[in-house]
Amino acid sequence: MKCFINFITGSKPSQYKKLGHAGIFRSSIPFSVEDFYKNHLEEGKVGSFFMRKIIIDCDPGIDDALAIMLAANSPELDILAITTVSGNVPSDMGAANARKVLKQLGRMDIPIYIGEEVPLREEYIDARDTHGMDGLGESFFPEVEGEYEKKNAVDFLTELLEREKISIIALGPMTNLAKVFSRKPELIANVEEMVSMGGSFKSHGNCSPVAEYNYWCDPDAAAVVYDLFAKAGSKIHMIGLDVTREIVLTPNRLEYMCRLDPEMGEFIRKITGFYMDFHWEQEGIIGCVINDPLAVAYFIDRSMCDGFDSFTVVATDGVCRGQTVVDSMNFWKKEPNSRILTETDSERFFAFFMERVLRKNDGSRWKKDE
């Protein structure tokens, strides 16, 4: 299976098509991940210059687990750390789940920082009705021994952004990020790109008529982050329900994954069975919507989704709690603080996901040098 690999390159620009953001080019030659590894990583041609430094801020969570699997198997990404926040599950349980996934991938080199336990103002309501009591579909994998990083995620992110420019893939409520940027708004200048799985434009909500769970769980945090990005003249790439609802892992796709890679396929089967039952009972869907991996795929390849720029605010109270109010008609005449993604190709996404994740390897290829 082939895919187009996006990467930062020192080769002649004339050989590549520009994707639309500085320094990133899309090769006109199809590469598999194996080809990319053989031709670049083994020969030492890819170092930190080629890889994009990222933080994954998440609340694992079934679909968060799948997103981590995709990110950890993508050679373009230098995962500096995973930070957890209370959302689908409490932040400490999310850290334990992230560790279980990293062990499965052979990526125990990635540090985990535990973040905020409760939303800024609202009572914390988890999503274990959707993700199971353990957050991984009641698979109840054994706990992975070891200590987490002692520093709180908010302090870690603050200190990291004071030192260097990074990108953030936010897959959960924005509580950690709201605390970081409220404390030091100037640090937004060191966020090269922010991709957030959350919100909705025209699609209905998944925990209220109008709201997606991540923003509904801590609406004040989402509102703060969108407001601060507007004041900083920056944009959040919003991977909302308009596109993620297209990404349905069906029983047929799951069976195909198990045939391609029995070990990894069975791991995915164990964590998604509960999720599939929930989607059938609640929405009549045969399969399950896996939101978060699309955010990772889009971060790697901008052509995975399409949309438009807009000024967006997040409602914080009443029946509209957590709703993303997108000024698509420019009534407010304000500079965009978001890119709203509205179109995606599910078949292309699943080809991308399976080509990267379903390979038998111990993950050591993508480990950072000791």
Where are these regions (language model features)?
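A residue-level signal for conserved active-site and pocket-lining positions in enzyme catalytic cores
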Residues: I112, V225, V296
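Short terminal hydrophobic/aromatic SLiMs and anchors at protein ends
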Residues: F7-T9, P13, I29, V33, ...
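Metal-dependent C-N hydrolase catalytic cores
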Residues: R52, A95-L161, P336-T344, F349-L358, ...
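Active-site histidine-anchored catalytic micro-motif
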Residues: R52-C58, I62-K100, F140-T244
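Short, Lys/Arg-enriched N-terminal segments with co-localized hydrophobic residues
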Residues: K38-F50
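Conformational coupling and interaction surfaces
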Residues: F49-R52, A71-N73, D78, W216-D220, ...
